[in-house]
Amino acid sequence: MDFKDYYKILDVEPAADDKAIKTAYRKLARKYHPDVSKEAGAEDKFKEASEAYEVLSSPEKRAEYDELRKYGRQGRPFQTPPGWQSRAGAGAGGFEETADFSEFFSSIFGGRPQQGGRTRNPGRKGQDVEMELAVFLEETLSGESKQVSFKVPQHSPNGQRMGDITKTLNVKIPAGVVDGERIRLKGQGAPGIGGGANGDLYLIIRLAPHPMFEVEGHDLVITVPLAPWEAALGTKVAVPTLTSRLNLTIRPDSQNGQRLRIKGNGLMNKSGERGDLYAQLKIVMPKQTDEAARALWQKLADSAAFDPRAQWKG
């Protein structure tokens, strides 16, 4: 096996302090992280930098490594001195799994299960990440793909927080999602520590407010403004839906607040069936009237035998 010069790998001097070592590792980890870098061999460089940091960030391991460093040079064959036994051990820095580390590391600090020996520690699962995702009502009908970007916490091999990276994914949103629903994307959270499994990403669906529709379960409600004479005489109105417009017949003598059901034009459920759209009528008075219009209103008032407050009279 070849000797590894951990100082050269991190590009620091042998006298570098802990801060310089940490800074150098963070720089390399961000550059070569498998979720970020598309460079050939990036994953191997990331593991190599992690191994170097595991040793140099631990005072015990670093002291033992410095003791052995005089016996080898980077890339040259190396063998531990006869009778060598690590006092620090593979897990002294808090790292729970060294199976991804090199034979060189294991020859110094141990950490690989011996033949027929104990079951290896599976390490720690990475941190789960949650984020809210705004979804438009129209997108819930067809299962749209959306690009999401989110922060993923990064940790050193010994579990120390090293900052965040930004990760971007194209995510297909299932049709029929509802507000508050949680969608799990397995393994898209923070990387595992010590060979542990990656955490998961949880998307919390938030239905974006719509300028025309209110949501009631899988049903939608739209307010349909009507002039007083339209409500009295009846009319046809082109009512918007999520996908088109439909002609709705308003019968004569319609009332303010009345709801008309338009079947199958609401939101989709998990079974692929759609709720209903309710058109709620709202009688709207003109903001201004001229003398001729007021004369017509007065004529109507004089001739109509209608008292809207009749129920108040005992």
Swiss-Prot record:
CC terms in the record's Gene Ontology section: cytoplasm; nucleoid
Keyword Metal-binding annotated: no
InterPro entries: DNA-bd_curved-DNA, DnaJ_C, DnaJ_domain, HSP40/DnaJ_pept-bd, J_dom_sf
Pfam families linked: DnaJ, DnaJ_C
Subcellular location: Cytoplasm, Nucleoid
Cystine pairings recorded for this chain: none
GO biological process, one term: protein refolding
J domain: residues covered: 5-69
Chain spans, region Disordered: 73-92
Keyword list, A-Z: Chaperone, Cytoplasm, DNA-binding
One Gene Ontology molecular-function label: bent DNA binding
Role played: DNA-binding protein that preferentially recognizes a curved DNA sequence. It is probably a functional analog of DnaJ; displays overlapping activities with DnaJ, but functions under different conditions, probably acting as a molecular chaperone in an adaptive response to environmental stresses other than heat shock. Lacks autonomous chaperone activity; binds native substrates and targets them for recognition by DnaK. Its activity is inhibited by the binding of CbpM.
Protein name according to UniProt: Curved DNA-binding protein
Organism encoding this protein: Pseudomonas syringae pv. tomato (strain ATCC BAA-871 / DC3000)
